[in-house]
C-alpha cells in the first residue's frame, strides 16, 4: 500500500468514527398516508369542528404525530383531503387507539359519506416554519 492509499484509508476511518454509525435499516421509516373523505354537506361545519379538535389534540399530545393537514377542494368543500405523517407505524397505530381519535370517529360517524385511505411514500417534502 502506498502513502496515498494509507491516507485515504485513514481519512475514511476517521470520518466514519466521527460521524458514528449509519442509521440502521431496521429502524422504522415514517408512516405517510392520505385520507380522502366525502362529507355530508349539511354537516360540514360540524365535521370541521370535530376534525379541528382532533387534529389540535393529536399534534399537542402525541409525539409520534408529525403532520396532519386537512384541506378541502375549493369548488367542492365537502371533499376533504387529510395529509398525515407519523414518526413510524407504531405512532400511527397509537394514534388510532387514542381517546381523542376514537371520539372524532364516533362524533363524525354519520357525517362521513365515504373514506379512502392511501398509503404513500415521501418523495420530496418541504416546509417553512411560520
Regions found by a protein language model. Give the residues of each.
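Glycine-rich beta-strand-turn "strand-cap" elements at beta-sheet edges
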Residues: 5-10, 14-31, 69-76, 105-130
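N-terminal targeting signals for Sec/Tat export/insertion, comprising classic cleavable signal peptides
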Residues: 31-61
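Short, well-ordered beta-strand segments in beta-rich or mixed alpha/beta enzyme
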Residues: 30-38, 67-96
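An amphipathic, aromatic/His-enriched active-site/gating alpha helix that lines ligand/cofactor pockets
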Residues: 7, 26, 52-67, 85-119
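N-terminal secretory signal peptides that target proteins for export/translocation
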Residues: 1-3
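Short acidic, gly/pro-rich beta-turn/loop elements at beta-sheet edges
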Residues: 45-47, 78-80, 127
